Amino acid sequence: MSAPDVTALLAELERSQPDLAEEARTAVEWLTGGEPLETVTQLDVCEFLWYTLPIKVGPLRPGGDHERLSRSLARLLQLGGMERYAALCVSPTTAQILRTYAQEGEDAGTSAYQKALEATGVLPPDVPELQWSMIMGPEELGAHVACSAALELAIVAGDDVDRSALTRRWLTEPRAELGGDSWLNRVHGERLNRWVLGRGPARRELAQPFEVRLYAPVTPQPLPALRKLLSLAASEGSLPLRLAPSPAALRLRELAERELGAISRDGARLAITVYGRHLLGSPEAMWEAVTRLLLARGEHEFEVSAREATLMLLADGVLMSPAQLRERVAEVVGGEGWHPATSLDDVTAPVADLVSQLTALGLAYSDDLVVRMDRPGQYAALAALRAHALRPRKYVSSG
């Protein structure tokens, strides 16, 4: 069967049902974006009917409504032999969602759309290798569409679909259409490039060498200081608080309790938590939790940028004085446009907090004169930067 031609289908509709042709033309142009009709997927149809149509497309005539537009599109798709997609256009789900938008507003309609989309089974889920972004670049969008199409085909074939397993396979296996590359590699490359090209020329210059260095996963390293603390807390159930530890040990205890949630207070003692036992039993989980923590703190993205610059400056094991480190971080972050003039005062707190974290964890040496990361600390910096660079893009709340 030949692929349906939109122009021919519209001409046929003009002859058979001229009252629907104009609205069908508008609907199909929005649906396809000028691409051939055979490239459309179920996800495309659902997103058009349940989001684009009620949010962006207005009725073409007085008294018209979105349900009429969807019925017009259904007739066009029927003529093209796309019965499954035509049925979606006139389904009770579509009618209910469009009425929800009309009667209860955009927020309620969007909520109904998201619930219905999840129920279709064609929405690729987040998987351990990749959390999908709200704002996708071209490569990620291509990966998302490809995974959705694979899910759709499996469902239509009547397979018992494990969405996560199929999505992971589709993302990680080499694809002939990508020249042997995988969609996951493409998405990671796109995200790394976007991260490098972030704010300001000074930051771009600092980040550029990391684009290649962060491409491959970083080998987890042992964290003996944290492991010892958790082991003590786990032995006989708790760790006495009356011990007089060093400042670094106090900071480690605070980090384990307040930032990781690995230990908790029990009167005059500290006891290991369920999560702490999980970390103690999995060096990989402990490494991931600690490295993600290095760039997770900060009430404002500015503080995260200061910590990020600190890690990049220290990642090669260079020896710097605390004053030099603060000055360089201020130079890098100052060019990102956060403030009219970023001063040392602005970066002092986030830099000092990060250095104290690294020192407490045994990942860096610091005193009043020098700061330097040892080899495990350099690996930790790379792992933290990689996780940050590969994070999904989210809409920024103005609240």
Provide a role label for each language-model segment.
Residues A11-Q17, A24-A108:
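N-terminal core-binding DNA-recognition domain of tyrosine recombinases/integrases
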Residues L49, V57-L60, E288-L295, T342:
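Long amphipathic alpha-helical scaffold regions
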Residues G64, R68, G81-A150, I272:
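Basic, alpha-helical nucleic-acid-binding regions used in initiation and control of genome expression
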Residues Y85-L98, A102-Q103, A207, R251-A256, ...:
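Accessory beta->alpha helical hairpin/"wing" motif in late/C-terminal subdomains of nucleic-acid enzymes
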Residues N185-K228, A233, P283-G334, P392-G399:
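Leucine-rich, amphipathic alpha-helical/linker segments
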Residues E308-G399:
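Elongated scaffolding segments in large macromolecular assemblies
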